[in-house]
């Protein structure tokens, strides 16, 4: 198995022009003409360290470059990170309850104590949710669309109220994780929770409640329910819609078009970008993927009038022999 370092790079990109005051002075007019108009970029550097408590329970330890044992969150800050991303699963009891709301609180408290910003990443599933699967939580199965909107809203508020009661104010909240194909739609899985594919390599959809292609209005309705729930607890939180393949402009127009045309709101667009796997999956070089993503960031920021953030990325940290 490849050695992989997964790092979350929060890059909040503010596209704007520098303000200039008018002047009748020729000298000032000359200086104004010579002034360079630059893009203003504010970076949040962070990591998704949601696994840290599970790793600690198994005896894993973390060390800085000097060989000093250091708690993982503190180590992230030592190396210049100023934000932490934490995923939330609804009922991960089949997976030892890691990433349930209580486990998230433990990690969020560490970040707060270090003065780091927190992003809460709702998966709205009992385990992993991504473009290939968005499995409906077991306790929500069989519910109607309206009932499931309430389930989603109540879960969102319950988790965020727990944060609030403990003095933690997330700066960002993801309503869904890589909802490229919607949210709250299920696929056939094995006992471990991994998707089972057909002979053509496609996942087998068993419930299409919030599938973006099959039920676009319901996908938008779920997102809107999550947005409103976040704002009820934290009115100033930045709500993110998170999609994968940040270089794919057609994908972003299609998915975000579903949301906006159905009245759903978002404050920020979050992107996943894995440039060093793009060649095998998408036939693009890493540079092509990165350049395409940067162009798409500028485009969607202007089109939808909001900031854009790379919320998920990853890269190899070692070669096949394990050499760093």
Task: Annotate the PLM regions.
Residues 2-10:
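Sec-dependent signal peptide recognition
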Residues 13-38:
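Bacterial Sec-dependent N-terminal signal peptides
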Residues 35-75:
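Boundary/entry segment of secreted carbohydrate-active catalytic domains
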Residues 57-60, 131-133, 185-188, 280-283, ...:
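Short acidic, glycine/proline-rich loop/turn micro-motifs
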Residues 60-61, 95-99, 281-288:
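Short, solvent-exposed loop/turn segments at secondary-structure boundaries
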Residues 70-73, 77, 232-242, 246-323:
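Glycoside hydrolase catalytic-domain groove-lining segments
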Residues 74-196, 203-215, 219-238, 244:
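Substrate-binding cleft and catalytic face of glycoside hydrolase catalytic domains
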């Amino acid at each position: 198995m490849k050695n992989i370092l997964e790092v979350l790079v929060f890059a909040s990109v503010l596209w704007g022009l520098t303000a200039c005051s008018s002047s009748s002075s020729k000298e000032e007019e000359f200086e104004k003409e010579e002034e360079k108009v630059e893009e203003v970029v504010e970076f949040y550097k962070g990591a998704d360290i949601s696994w840290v408590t599970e790793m600690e329970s198994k005896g894993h330890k973390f060390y800085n470059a000097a060989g000093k044992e250091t708690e993982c969150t503190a180590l992230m800050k030592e190396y210049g990170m100023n934000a932490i991303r934490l995923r939330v699963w609804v009922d991960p009891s089949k997976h030892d309850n890691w990433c349930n709301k209580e486990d998230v609180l433990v990690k969020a408290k560490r970040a707060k104590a270090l003065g780091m910003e927190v992003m809460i990443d709702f998966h709205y599933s009992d385990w992993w949710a991504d473009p290939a699967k968005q499995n409906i939580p077991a306790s929500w199965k069989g519910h109607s669309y309206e009932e499931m909107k309430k389930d989603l809203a109540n879960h969102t508020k319950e988790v965020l109220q727990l944060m609030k009661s403990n003095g933690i104010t997330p700066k960002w909240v993801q309503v869904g994780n890589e909802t490229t194909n919607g949210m709250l739609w299920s696929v056939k899985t094995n006992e471990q929770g991994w998707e089972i594919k057909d002979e053509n390599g496609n996942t087998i959809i068993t419930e299409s409640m919030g599938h973006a292609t099959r039920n676009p209005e319901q996908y938008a309705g779920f997102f809107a329910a999550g947005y409103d729930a976040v704002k009820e607890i934290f009115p100033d939180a930045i709500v993110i819609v998170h999609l994968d393949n940040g270089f794919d402009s057609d994908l972003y127009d299609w998915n975000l078009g579903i949301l906006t045309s159905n009245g759903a709101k978002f404050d920020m667009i979050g992107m996943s970008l894995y440039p060093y796997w793009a060649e095998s999956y998408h036939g693009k070089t890493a540079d092509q993927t990165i350049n395409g993503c940067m162009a798409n960031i500028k485009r969607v920021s202007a089109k939808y009038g909001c900031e854009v953030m790379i919320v998920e990325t990853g890269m190899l940290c070692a070669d096949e022999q394990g050499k760093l």
